[in-house]
Amino acid sequence: MFSRVLFSILFFLGCCPSLFADVDSPQRATFGQPAVMLGIAIVFFYFILWRPEQKRRQAMEKRKSELAVGDKVTAMGIVGTIAEIREHTVVLNIASGKIEILKAAISEIFKAEK
């Protein structure tokens, strides 16, 4: 919703000079207007798209560093309980045995209740 409103405002601002320009005056190419629009687009992408994703990624990395034996995790649709933690992998107990997966493949972490 917010992004639609922001896009509408940016579109209107981009069209404003052509709406209110005199018909008789010649249009001259300026660097200012495209530079301002590019700056607004960069700020938009930073605050709306990139920054929240960066925060989410940092929070997940922190949670992965705090993994403990007994935590329940999901990885690529597989749900298991951590049996062993290694440097870059974890060993999961699943219904039919154990599997080893990369820590990077873990998508959700459910802490073990103590």
Swiss-Prot record:
GO biological process per UniProt: protein transport
Membrane-traversing stretches: 30-50
Cellular location(s): Cell inner membrane
Keyword Lyase applies: no
Top-level taxon of origin: Bacteria
Entry keyword Kinase: no
One Gene Ontology CC term in the entry: plasma membrane
Membrane topology: Single-pass membrane protein
Subunit organization: Part of the SecDF-YidC-YajC translocase complex. The SecDF-YidC-YajC translocase forms a supercomplex with SecYEG, called the holo-translocon (HTL).
Family of the protein in this entry: Belongs to the YajC family.
Protein task: The SecYEG-SecDF-YajC-YidC holo-translocon (HTL) protein secretase/insertase is a supercomplex required for protein secretion, insertion of proteins into membranes, and assembly of membrane protein complexes. While the SecYEG complex is essential for assembly of a number of proteins and complexes, the SecDF-YajC-YidC subcomplex facilitates these functions.
Entry-linked NCBIfam families: yajC
Protein name: Sec translocon accessory complex subunit YajC
High-level lineage: Bacteria, Pseudomonadati, Chlamydiota, Chlamydiia, Chlamydiales
Protein's gene: yajC
